[in-house]
Amino acid sequence: TVVAVFLISSPWWMQSSDWFTTGFWIFAATGLFHPALSLYFTLESMDRAGATVSSTLAATSPIFAALTAMILLGENMTLLIAIGTLVTMCGVMSLTWIPGTGITKVMRVALLFATAAAVIRGLINTTGKFGLDLMPNAMMAGFLSHTVGGLGVLVIYRLRRGRLPLNMSGAGLRAFGLSGCFIAIAIACMYSALLRNSVTLVSPVIGTYPVFTLLAALALKEEKITLQIAGGVTVVVAGVVLINWV
């Protein structure tokens, strides 16, 4: 669905010159790592340790994005952005972490997979910024990375499950179709933000997505407001305010 949304809208943004740039190949290669490889690592982590640990470690991706941006792109991180990034990460972690969840021997491999997925997500923001400098087309960037990534996900699913997901209900198809539309919009917004701002500024804000997941769940009455949720959302908002404070 994500690729279909980009293709349908392509007459308004696709340019033939983009196909012959170095940035084209950067985003094509990017798709092999995210969403393809990062999804594989996430699934392995969830199978071994569950969604809680996996989601908590996913919140650390902004720090990897900031580090790689400073090393590879020469970006500078102000004190407010550094503090805001750490505050935001702590807030997101507080939303997903269950007290009393310890680290066991069984979970150690899962932690490696989850950390690898977080590193990839962080690095993708840096490579995306570099690619956009060579091919300043946010829509093309999203189209390329998720076309290649979508094919990679199908290959991974086939290897893991032994078959492709061909039998789906109508309700499931509609739900995934709607989800794909939102994901396509989110991807376009992310690359548009990276096109205009630094990785150290954009990445921590992107990392707040679990907050909106919780808010949507609350709106659909699938979650109840608890002290942990209220506190976590407050901390995340405070972190984002610090990051964008001028």
Residue ranges: model-predicted function:
Residues 1-29, 39-49, 97-115, 134, ...:
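Membrane-interface interhelical linkers
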Residues 42-43, 54, 65, 69, ...:
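Interfacial helix-capping/hinge residues at the ends of transmembrane alpha-helices
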Residues 18-34, 74-90, 136-151, 192-209:
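Structural signature of hydrophobic alpha-helical transmembrane segments
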Residues 31-36, 40, 62-67, 118, ...:
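Hydrophobic/small/kink-forming positions within alpha-helical transmembrane segments
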Residues 109-133, 137-140:
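Selected transmembrane alpha-helices and immediately adjacent juxtamembrane segments
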Residues 45, 71-77, 131, 141, ...:
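Hydrophobic/aromatic residues within transmembrane alpha-helices
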Residues 60-119, 218, 224-246:
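Juxtamembrane helix-loop boundary signature in multi-pass membrane transporters
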Residues 1-5, 57-71, 86, 148-152, ...:
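Alpha-helical transmembrane segments of compact multi-pass small-molecule transporters, enriched
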